[in-house]
């Protein structure tokens, strides 16, 4: 059902390595190019002594500022610093990570200070960039968005993504799974009978496989499986390791000591990987890579396929379980749709084709764009734009990626909502006490497929107190699990005889204390937005003074004019121009008013002299050949704003250096047991 929303709505694919945004216009999806003309934007955020850069501008300067350029923030959401995946990736990240109470945190130097950010804060900055890309295209404010997440994202990661949207000033209409969004892109115009479609989504850092049935506008997810840490960046890492060893072998030098050299090599490896999707061989050429040594090498497609063979074979592992869960055979799959840039790799396509007995994958849609495309369609529907014939009767039925349950006596996982259950959904079950006269119960909530809770992921917990003294097994406690359309998980428990009730929205240990943190981040975003705007105006004033000074110098040196100005006047202007340029070089961070004051000083000397010259020329019949090199104009306009490439208002330095404080106590508490 459409929501009552104001303002424009967009669909955003918030990717690990690249992000993409679309809007519904003229009865179709428009995937929007950014200010560099690219339809995907790097999910990079860089911090310097003066500004924050996002997207292409951040990625372009990463070799020079590696320690303060953050990427891959998405997989960090909801992962602790001690997580094996985080520890395995640290060696590939030049930026610093530290351990927060809830998850790993990112530490950078920004404007001369050490700042700590949560991963969702970095994601919110990328979302701000995508919103601004859309606003530049539409010409109006964007207020609402549908944002996609990997199908394997757990409840807390989905909530954190929603939080990132809120910090970015967006009303998040819905969080939807990436493979489901891609299926919409494939099936929007498909009419006719039921079709079973396998979405094979291999991106930069995530991998999902989903099986959907599409029939007359109804998209129903039958099953989903994933590898939570597999993608194009793993292939890049193999190439980097290969060439690092080659450089060491040839030159007896270890480039892993130098982050700038490593970053330049990684960029070249990513380019080579892309080349190998269409060519049998790729060349690596990097001038002065390390200690003044030029590095040249080649890599063949066969060698690349061999070094990444285990990863490529790993992409096939989730496919069979997805078919099994959906109760379908290979022959019953009508289409295999490729999503994500890494599906361009020929070996991946070949393995997939071999698995489906020679059936070729569908390559009719650009693998970089279908996720944003599907999110845009969903945004159009949810914002009430369903008057379009194409959008009418379209229904999206997603599933929960993991089983949800609670701990009963003995640490047993009792499942209430099974994996691949269609959402939204609601399920209740009755439990009782484990001991006589037990005054309360501790309800611990888990997600996962293992029989014991210790092997699953703890989502949250809460107490239900005030149970009257009764023998064990007598109290009747109704526990209800409720998952909404965003996949957000709500749990309530009621003791029947007293009506005592308690409930929780599972947001990964973030019940009440989380809200004020989000509010603080939002207010910081507003604060730094105005600060960034002021910095933008300051740089415009600096550029205006610089352009005025150099234009004035060019005017004095112009062949047609230099003889028209008396030497004393010319020297007065030249001395003041030189003084101003020297002052500019020494005062790159001055205030707007200082730049404007310096420009007025320069104008005070130059304007009377130039006016006298032009007046004399006018009396003599005009300036020969016109008046080239007129200084001045509009300060801040000539040459654009070189100091702000891709920089975006709304930064949120500061973070939360100590991590979030705990909201509830230890694991100890009275147990609960299942009622037969």
From Swiss-Prot:
One of its GO terms (molecular function) is ATP-dependent protein folding chaperone. It holds the Pfam family HSP70. Keywords: ATP-binding, Chaperone, Nucleotide-binding, Stress response. The keyword Ribosomal protein does not apply. Residues 657-676 are annotated as: Disordered. InterPro entries: ATPase_NBD, Heat_shock_70_CS, HSP70_C_sf, HSP70_peptide-bd_sf, Hsp_70_fam. Disulfide bonds: none annotated. CDD domains: ASKHA_NBD_HSP70_HSPA1. Belongs to the heat shock protein 70 family. This is Heat shock 70 kDa protein. It comes from Bremia lactucae (Lettuce downy mildew). The gene is HSP70.
